[in-house]
């Protein structure tokens, strides 16, 4: 006789939430991760790090819970970011990487190309530039052409394509501009927000309005030791 489980423990709660979301909507569950200063700035002028080492290590653990990370060519070009798991015991070829690059502006000399030989990397574009498409394909990047990526309908088609490729849990790591777009389209479920205890003032800025940050609600602080930093999980309105 099979015993019916009445309660799901906290360890598996997120998994089951995404499972039921996938089953109901035939779409991947989309969450986001963002780092901000005490005065709610997301970019530091002379460094790409806003939060401390402990926060970044926990960020790698969060990444490991997702099938893929979505970022934009703008964010990757700015930080030369790998967007993988880089702490001992985790697979540094995971999660898979999805790059949104409408006009194929991704730089040709980036660290992620070295990992693309073994790591699944997808690039979604609306460009017809065959020369650049050939270049990226030679770098072992799977280029997928979209007719358009500007409306909610377009983005739902994009997410359904990722679902078809087997992606069930997706983490967004990008700038405020892109997050504002997805928030307005109501395509993000939860947000992990790492908050520094340091005000950046004139040494920091935002590249877009803080609409995304203002859209967050039901903040819950996660009990993890990040020294002076704090980690919150919130839902998007």
Regions flagged by a language model, labelled:
Residues 3, 7-237:
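Enzymes that bind and transform nitrogen-containing heteroaromatic metabolites
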